[in-house]
A protein has these predicted regions:
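Conserved phosphate/ATP/ADP-binding segment of small-molecule kinases
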Residues: 172-260
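Conserved post-catalytic alpha-helical subdomain immediately downstream of the catalytic base
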Residues: 263-333, 340
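A short helix->loop->beta-strand "cap" motif at the edges of active sites that frequently abuts
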Residues: 154-161, 232-235
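Acidic-glycine-rich active-site phosphate/pyrophosphate-binding loop
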Residues: 6-20, 250-265
């Protein structure tokens, strides 16, 4: 297994119980999560030496976030302690035709105001096999964008494979700001992960699909994958393809391109969805594990898609599944029968 490093923000997630609306709720369910933190948990569950890099306050809420990571085997040696705030997000889980809603309260969080001197990225990347980040981190603040660049530069100095999940968040920045920051960072990236909306808004590649209508067109991606690989020199371009029938019923598959061949995964019909937050992150964790351990891109992709399908059945941000569970589903065991 490898040493995997991720950089980003872990937040306090406050979600309404069940499918109640914000205006109805008298209480919140509390967990922790965040894009790159979720990926680190997945990698730790699969047996990798997973490190999460961030900055968290020294108070009890900051420590609780650290404890949440340690609980699932993520190494916290490179978490800087300081600052005043842990970012928060509020989640209202949708149902049927009513979509889920997220409200962010993350401005001026510790990682958003972190300085380069808070991290020794050369020490962090020493001996690492993989570094993962997402487009959420540079969107948090200009300081976080600079940290992302410095981490990528250190990763390249140490010969570390770099992956990005483009992860566009319209509540954090505009597509113009996103492209001005993200495009220059692509020079450091080996593996680019993103869906149809991310490719368009972060990098300017428009697929032949109606995202809002829940359409996915695998054939329409091939030209885009080739163009992305040619422009930025990616070793792999990977995309999930989600068919959204309702908030609780999705079709789910993915494609990968290695510069020569395309591979499209099997499709999963996920119904009912228990919690789709973290679904993309679980896919990223799966593709990292797959590309580090599997014999070819097809096997890597099948592992990632199965891992992510399982995440949709688990409450919370983290994908709490084992390699054996993922491989059982990837191998065709989707019956859901009791394991005795």
């Amino acid at each position: 297994m490898g040493k995997v490093v991720t950089l980003g923000e872990i937040m306090l997630r406050l979600s309404t119980p069940g499918n109640t609306r914000f205006v109805q709720s008298d209480s919140f369910d509390v967990v922790y999560g965040g894009g790159e933190a979720n990926v680190a948990v997945s990698c730790a569950n699969y047996g990798h030496e997973a490190y999460f890099v961030t900055k968290l306050p020294k108070h009890e809420i900051g420590q609780s976030a650290v404890n949440a990571l340690r609980k699932y085997g993520v190494k916290t040696d490179f978490i800087c302690r300081g600052g005043d705030r842990v970012g928060i997000y509020y989640l209202e889980t949708g149902a049927s035709m009513r979509p889920s809603k997220v409200i962010y309260d993350r401005a001026h969080s510790a990682i958003a105001e972190a300085d380069p001197c808070d991290f020794d990225f050369d020490a962090i990347m020493e001996g690492a096999d993989w570094f993962h980040w997402s487009g959420i981190t540079p969107a948090i603040s200009d300081k976080a964008a600079e940290l992302t660049k410095l981490a990528c530069e250190a990763a390249k100095r140490h010969g570390v494979t770099v992956s990005v999940d483009l992860n566009f968040r319209k509540k954090l920045w505009t597509k113009e700001k996103a492209q001005s920051i993200m495009k220059p960072l692509m020079q450091y990236v080996d593996v680019c992960i993103g869906n149809e909306e991310d490719a368009e808004l972060c990098l300017g590649f428009k697929p032949e699909a109606n995202v809002e209508a829940g359409e996915t067109n695998a054939e329409g991606y091939k030209g885009i994958f080739k163009a992305m690989a040619k422009e930025f020199g990616f070793k792999y371009v990977v995309s999930t393809l989600r068919e959204s029938f309702s908030a609780t019923h999705n079709g789910w598959k993915a494609m990968i391109y290695n510069g020569e061949e395309f591979y499209e995964s099997k499709r999963y019909d996920i119904n009912p969805i228990i919690d789709r937050v973290g679904g993309g992150d679980s896919f990223s964790g799966g593709i990292i594990h797959g590309l580090l351990t599997k014999p070819n891109q097809g096997a890597a992709l099948e592992f990632a898609v199965a891992a992510s399908a399982l995440k949709h059945t688990i409450n919370g941000d983290f994908n709490l599944v084992s390699v054996d569970e993922v491989e059982a589903l990837a191998g065709g065991n989707a019956s859901g029968r009791v394991q005795r």
